[in-house]
């Protein structure tokens, strides 16, 4: 009997040890999963493919093969695949399936982009498959526009009138019309292409599309910002302080455009130097808008289940957790301006030792205004009201700084 009790005791201890080991292993695994998730969130390029010339040339060769087979078309296909007027130069980057390549087009440097590598990887237009038979009746334009409007709504979260959608879609049937439809449909499934096609007429801070071939589209090449640049952007040492003031003012202009000039506010959820470039006149241009969302889509993204505020952070767009219902609020609590102040302006204006041509008092005021701007919102949730006030303060201080720098040159 004592022996049986001893065996039961050893079995109980063994069971407790196994349970403890399992719990420890589960905690260890959860820790690594969390660490991996945080790493991927901060550095999405970790899982990116290696960007090589060989792979990039192979991708474009496959694109041209699909063009010759009559599967796709576009204004740039002839120059790329036949005429030799659009020439590959180098691979810029691959990230999360997206392919970004540099090319030379008729003496102009351009960037070729696609969300996916192969044309066949995009879901086809259902109506085209249904009407694929020879002599099949034409697809009603009303049906097509309805599908396009639905895809745009799914992409942007916006309902647009037909006249706004027109630039995205081939107007009338004719030779090669099916290839045009198939190509346009693959482009419509790329959020950035839709932004670049619809918004440049409304804002100078968005790149226009120059043309396309199948699922690849071309935009102007502009040197992107980088944390490796001392001034975040490629600027000459001479006149750098003036250039930074001009660029900062252009960032403010962009914030104003994105907050006010569209039917809904446009939220930037991935603010970093690499996603912006500057033109020769120091105009800031958003060159990567994969993480930009209009208000309806932003609300949909933010409104998720939560156990704390940290669950309501979507990259640079933050919400707050309502612990009564364990749901993130649909309203963003920080702003584009706040994030730009934090991630861009702090780098330029965090020290009063810069720009000796500018008075110490003005440098100190600008430093304090940037600090105030970067810290607004988040806890109070009143970031939009606060941003409006600090926006005008920053604008006045930057204009005053620019004036002092220009007068010092005389």
UniProtKB/Swiss-Prot annotation:
In terms of InterPro entries, this protein maps to:
FAM69_kinase_dom (IPR022049), FAM69_N (IPR029244)
**Could you tell me which residue ranges are on the Cytoplasmic side of the membrane?**
1-19
Where primarily located?
A: endoplasmic reticulum
The cellular component terms of Gene Ontology attached to this UniProt record, alphabetical and capped at eight, are: endoplasmic reticulum membrane
Cellular compartments annotated? Endoplasmic reticulum membrane
The tissues where this chain's protein is expressed are given as:
Mainly expressed in the brain and eye, some expression in kidney and skeletal muscle.
Sequence motif May mediate ER retention, location on chain: 18-19
Looking at the UniProt entry, the stretches that span the membrane are: 20-40
Per the UniProt topology annotation, the Lumenal ranges are 41-410
Regions annotated as coiled coil: none
Modification after translation (UniProt): Among the many cysteines in the lumenal domain, most are probably involved in disulfide bonds.
Alphabetically ordered keywords of this record: Disulfide bond, Endoplasmic reticulum, Membrane, Signal-anchor, Transmembrane, Transmembrane helix
Membrane topology annotation? Single-pass type II membrane protein
Q: Which domain of life is it from?
A: Eukaryota
- Family under the similarity heading: Belongs to the DIPK family.
Put simply, this protein is called Divergent protein kinase domain 1C
- The scientific name of the source species is Mus musculus (Mouse)
């Amino acid at each position: 009997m004592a022996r049986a009790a001893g065996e039961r005791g050893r079995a109980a201890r063994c069971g407790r040890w196994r349970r403890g080991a399992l719990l420890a292993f589960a905690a260890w695994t959860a820790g690594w999963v969390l660490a991996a998730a945080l790493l991927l969130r901060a550095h999405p390029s970790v899982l990116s493919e290696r960007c090589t010339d060989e792979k990039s040339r192979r991708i474009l060769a496959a694109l041209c093969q699909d063009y010759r087979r009559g599967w796709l078309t576009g204004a740039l296909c002839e120059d790329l695949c036949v005429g030799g007027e659009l020439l590959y130069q180098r691979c810029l980057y691959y990230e999360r399936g997206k392919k970004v390549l540099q090319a030379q087009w008729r003496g102009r440097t351009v960037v070729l982009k696609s969300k996916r590598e192969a044309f066949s990887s995009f879901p086809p237009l259902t109506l085209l498959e249904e009407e694929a038979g020879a002599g099949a009746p034409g697809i009603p334009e009303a049906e097509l526009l309805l599908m396009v409007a639905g895809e745009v709504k799914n992409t942007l979260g916006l309902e647009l009138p037909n006249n706004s959608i027109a630039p995205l879609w081939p107007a009338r049937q004719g030779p090669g019309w099916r290839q045009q439809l198939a190509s346009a449909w693959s482009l419509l499934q790329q959020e950035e292409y839709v932004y670049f096609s619809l918004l440049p007429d409304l804002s100078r801070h968005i790149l226009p599309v120059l043309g396309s071939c199948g699922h690849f589209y071309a935009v102007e090449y502009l040197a992107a910002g980088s944390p490796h640049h001392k001034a975040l952007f490629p600027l000459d040492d001479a006149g750098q302080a003036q250039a930074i003031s001009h660029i900062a003012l252009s960032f403010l202009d962009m914030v104003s455009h994105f907050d006010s000039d569209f039917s809904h506010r446009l939220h930037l959820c991935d603010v970093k130097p690499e996603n912006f470039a500057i033109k020769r006149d120091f105009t800031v241009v958003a060159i990567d808008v994969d993480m930009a969302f209009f208000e309806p889509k932003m609300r949909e993204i933010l409104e998720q289940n939560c156990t704390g505020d940290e669950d309501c952070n979507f990259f640079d767009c933050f919400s707050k957790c309502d612990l009564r219902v364990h749901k993130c609020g649909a309203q963003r609590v920080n702003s584009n301006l706040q994030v730009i102040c934090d991630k861009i302006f702090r780098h330029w204006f965090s020290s009063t030792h810069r720009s000796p041509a500018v008075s110490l008092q003005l440098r100190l005021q600008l430093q304090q205004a940037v600090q105030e701007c970067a810290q607004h919102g988040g806890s109070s949730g009143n970031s939009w009201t606060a941003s409006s006030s600090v926006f005008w303060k920053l604008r006045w201080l930057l204009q005053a700084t620019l004036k002092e720098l220009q007068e010092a040159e005389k």
